[in-house]
Amino acid sequence: MVDSKKRPGKDLDRIDRNILNELQKDGRISNVELSKRVGLSPTPCLERVRRLERQGFIQGYTALLNPHYLDASLLVFVEITLNRGAPDVFEQFNTAVQKLEEIQECHLVSGDFDYLLKTRVPDMSAYRKLLGETLLRLPGVNDTRTYVVMEEVKQSNRLVIKTR
């Protein structure tokens, strides 16, 4: 995790920010095309991309898959409340949830519950099985609340990167 007080992104210049914006739009863009879009020649553009990778601004490249084509149509969010009796319950939960491929995201949150999970499964039957056989058996789980998504109105992984 990056120290928020250091804010490494504030040191990025306009070209670095443009590179990041273009790569968010299309991670498979060729270096030649990227260099044209940001106004650099190919070699300095590639050097900047490599530097942004080394510095951790770019964590990797991935393909966005269509869950409806891959038997993962049902999107479910789950609130998890832990039994706080054990002193290391959060660490145990964190370790256990890391091992679950079905969980796409897990966030420790403030408020009325402790964690918010995001998962995709084929259907409600598969979710019931995941809940009963896996989620309720995670260390320290005291209560869950499930939200089934009826319609995905907006989904994006892009970050807002302002160009100065």
Curated annotation (Swiss-Prot):
Superkingdom per UniProt: Bacteria
GO biological process annotation, one example: negative regulation of DNA-templated transcription
UniProt subunit comment: Homodimer.
Name recorded for this polypeptide: Leucine-responsive regulatory protein
Keywords, comma-separated and alphabetical: Activator, DNA-binding, Transcription, Transcription regulation
Function: Mediates a global response to leucine. Exogenous leucine affects the expression of a number of different operons; lrp mediates this effect for at least some of these operons. For example it is regulator of the branched-chain amino acid transport genes.
GO molecular function, one term: DNA-binding transcription repressor activity
PANTHER family: LEUCINE-RESPONSIVE REGULATORY PROTEIN (PTHR30154:SF0)
GO cellular component terms given for this protein: cytosol; protein-DNA complex
Residue ranges of domain HTH asnC-type in the record: 12-73
DNA-binding residues (ranges): 31-50
